[in-house]
């Protein structure tokens, strides 16, 4: 959702989504993350996430932000060596396994805070920076998102009900 340069083919397309199981993948501030023993290609993705404050279903973009209670950050960890499925037909819907690479214990550190929506003057102008050890690995701004917060919340609410406390990650720079 935050590419260095948007692919013209992505403009006008609906958001591409995957789901993360919250019970075992989410880990709070100060929690531990264990790199899965089966992965040799482990990486990270800094993302802003919106936290839903009110139940919503079938809402439109114009009203979507009324349902956002606040913002937090997540680190979307991935076992990249499990991204491509062996023997899958290249370009097919079955080529990538987003569940295995994204859903393992501790795969999504979150927080440490939820900042109320009212306390962020312009959520579409937040700098995002991620360092690994002392090396800056990601440097972007939420203004670069292809799909803005309201678009993502509205789109998801048209597929299933969102409840207070649901977390919608917005993609990585």
Regions found by a protein language model. Give the residues of each.
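Extended, compositionally biased flexible segments
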Residues: 1-39, 44
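A generic local secondary-structure boundary/capping motif
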Residues: 5-8, 34-42, 48, 56-63, ...
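Structural motif
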Residues: 15-17, 24-25, 32, 47-49, ...
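Short, structured patches in soluble enzyme cores that scaffold and shape functional sites
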Residues: 18-22, 44-48, 52-54, 72-77, ...
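Short helix/loop capping segments that flank catalytic or ligand/cofactor-binding pockets
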Residues: 27-28, 59-61, 81-83
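Alpha-helical secondary-structure segments
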Residues: 65-68
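Catalytic-pocket segment enriched in acidic/His residues
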Residues: 80-173
């Amino acid at each position: 959702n935050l590419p260095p340069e948007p692919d013209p083919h992505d403009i006008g397309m609906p958001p591409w989504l995957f789901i993360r199981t919250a019970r075992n993948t989410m880990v709070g501030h100060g929690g531990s993350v264990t790199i899965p023993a089966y992965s040799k290609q482990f990486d990270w993705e800094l993302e802003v996430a919106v936290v839903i404050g009110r139940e919503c279903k079938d809402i439109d973009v114009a009203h979507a932000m009324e349902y956002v209670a606040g913002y937090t950050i997540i680190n979307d960890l991935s076992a990249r060596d499990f991204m491509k499925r062996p023997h899958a037909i290249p370009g097919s819907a079955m080529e990538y396994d987003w569940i295995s690479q994204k859903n393992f214990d501790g795969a999504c550190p979150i927080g440490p805070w939820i900042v109320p929506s009212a306390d962020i003057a312009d959520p579409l102008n937040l700098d995002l920076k991620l360092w690994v050890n002392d090396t800056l690995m990601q440097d972007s701004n939420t203004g670069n998102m292809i799909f803005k917060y309201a678009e993502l919340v509205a789109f998801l609410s048209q597929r299933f009900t969102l409840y207070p406390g649901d977390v919608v990650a917005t993609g990585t720079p």
